[in-house]
Amino acid sequence: MIHMTPEHVRWFADTGKSVTTSEGKEIKIWEFKHENDEEVLKGWSKHFRQHYCLDEEIDEFREGYGFSRAEFLEKIKFPDRYKAPGPSTRSGDFSEILVSDYLEFILSYWVPRTRYGSKTIGNESTKGCDVMAFKFINEEKETPEDTLAIFEAKAQFSGTTVKPRLQDAVNDSVKDQIRKAESLNAIKQQLYYKQKIQDAKLINRFQNPVDRPYKEVSGAVALFSSNLFNTEKIAETYVSEHPNEQNIQLLVIHGEDMMNLVHELYRRAADEA
């Protein structure tokens, strides 16, 4: 479960600023200060590509099509750059993966990356909870302080009218109470199929909260291109109807020209395979 921290993680910057909602909830503000750094982007594109298809699997999967590696990824695995709903699926997948990186490499959770490789239709979003992350106090012994974090991510990287994406993430997070059991099973099955048996068994810890209690943290994240980041709009977010209201974390991540970054990362992920 120990992974090297990818270089692009250094582009996460805690602004030290926050916004307080009318309910008194704190919204933390982070910035993603990406740069045109060839080596960092190259490493990031490989990290990103592995979510959809491991490099050692591509040749086997593309063989019957007669596609190059890039063609297989672009035509079969990745959301389409132009054909709807491909662009919105791209921004959604990208955002979920970026939030996964935040949880794993900044907050030190274990985040299984099983959500995208099993997609049947590249242009469609995967059903279930967006990001599930796990923290064990002691892997040898269960404690009530073991934590399951379930985060929902919503993005707006284009357009001119600011949308209430943080509220959308909160509203979607409400549904996670219903989706949790099935999403845990989906992760466990994919780990099992990948022969990661010990990792799959770790999911057992969180499948029976009545008999084996643990902490559950909810999270709602809005990701914006910086020109669409509006503090007044996000301050309108409310969580009073959320079943985990006392344990929900609110976060905004914004960065410059994010949609072009999304497309560039997908291009690199295909071309550099």
Tell me what each language-model feature is:
Residues F134-I150:
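Active-site beta-strand-loop-beta-strand hairpin of nuclease catalytic cores
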Residues G159-F229:
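Acidic, metal/cofactor-coordinating or nucleic-acid-engaging core segments within structured domains
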Residues I106-E124:
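A short acidic/basic microdomain associated with nuclease active sites
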Residues L103, V131-A133, A149-A155:
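Conserved catalytic cores of phosphodiester-cleaving nucleases, focusing on short active-site segments
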Residues F78-S100, T120-G122:
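A short, highly charged nucleic-acid-interacting micro-segment common to nuclease
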Residues K201-A273:
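Charged, structured surface patches that assemble and position nucleic-acid processing machinery
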Residues M1-S68, K77, R267-A273:
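Nuclease-adjacent, charged terminal/linker segments that flank catalytic cores
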Residues I76, N123-A133:
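Charged, often glycine-rich, active-site loop that binds/positions anionic groups
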